[in-house]
């Protein structure tokens, strides 16, 4: 019997990290769209406890987790990973990647981030080693491609490449992204402006009840 010439393909698991302060439609709709586009077997929203690159957060750990659980009732194809929250210390992505790789040894791992985060990657702890633990997926707007060869990743625009090996590629998703930011929402909360259309009604009700 002739052996198959096809190499093994790996199921892809995505991890979208952030402070989610608060989680909003910009996060949720873009994540759901990306899960479908990349055919991810799972996409985890991974909230951090104490983000190294941000100042004090507006919502507590428990409040942010509560809002994430409310969010995935509407976006039920998404999941939550609370590993970084449970560490109760500064959140270094490299530590999470090492843990994730050890837990999901038979999967391709995608670390998902927006363009703003990618543009600060040079300041992240051990960023030059990320390629050993994951693929990097950047949620960028169509036409935006500012990648230079660094961090050890190889550029690809072929989704199937992410299934052929577990780590090492960078992929620009070119989503039709919603232009919503947590800072805009925080400003509206402080000035008591309408939040409709920016985040799920269940989260708006939660915030209003605080």
Swiss-Prot record:
Keywords: ATP-binding, NAD, Nucleotide-binding, Nucleotidyltransferase, Pyridine nucleotide biosynthesis, Transferase. Pathway: Cofactor biosynthesis; NAD(+) biosynthesis; deamido-NAD(+) from nicotinate D-ribonucleotide: step 1/1. It is an enzyme of class 2 (transferase). It catalyses: nicotinate beta-D-ribonucleotide + ATP + H(+) = deamido-NAD(+) + diphosphate. GO terms for molecular function: ATP binding; nicotinate-nucleotide adenylyltransferase activity. Pfam families: CTP_transf_like. Signal peptide: none annotated. It comes from the Bacteria. Catalyzes the reversible adenylation of nicotinate mononucleotide (NaMN) to nicotinic acid adenine dinucleotide (NaAD). This is Probable nicotinate-nucleotide adenylyltransferase. The lineage of its organism: Bacteria, Pseudomonadati, Pseudomonadota, Gammaproteobacteria, Candidatus Pseudothioglobaceae.
């Amino acid at each position: 019997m002739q052996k198959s010439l096809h190499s093994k393909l790996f199921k892809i698991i995505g991890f979208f990290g952030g402070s989610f302060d608060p989680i909003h439609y910009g996060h949720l709709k873009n994540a759901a769209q990306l899960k479908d586009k990349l055919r991810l077997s799972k996409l985890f929203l991974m909230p951090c406890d104490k983000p190294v690159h941000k100042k004090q957060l507006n919502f507590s750990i428990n409040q942010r987790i509560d809002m994430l659980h409310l969010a995935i009732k509407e976006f039920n194809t998404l999941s939550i990973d609370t590993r970084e929250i449970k560490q109760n210390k500064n959140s270094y992505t490299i530590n999470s990647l090492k843990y994730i790789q050890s837990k999901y040894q038979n999967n391709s791992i995608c670390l998902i981030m927006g363009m703003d985060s990618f543009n600060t990657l040079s300041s992240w702890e051990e960023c030059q080693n990320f390629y050993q633990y994951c693929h990097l997926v950047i949620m960028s707007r169509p036409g935006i491609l500012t990648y230079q060869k660094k961090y050890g990743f190889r550029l690809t625009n072929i989704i199937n490449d992410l299934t052929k090996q577990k780590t090492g590629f960078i992929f620009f998703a070119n989503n039709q992204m919603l232009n919503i930011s947590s800072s805009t929402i925080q400003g509206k909360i402080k000035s008591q402006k309408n939040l409709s259309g920016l985040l799920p009604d269940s989260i708006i009700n939660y915030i209003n009840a605080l």
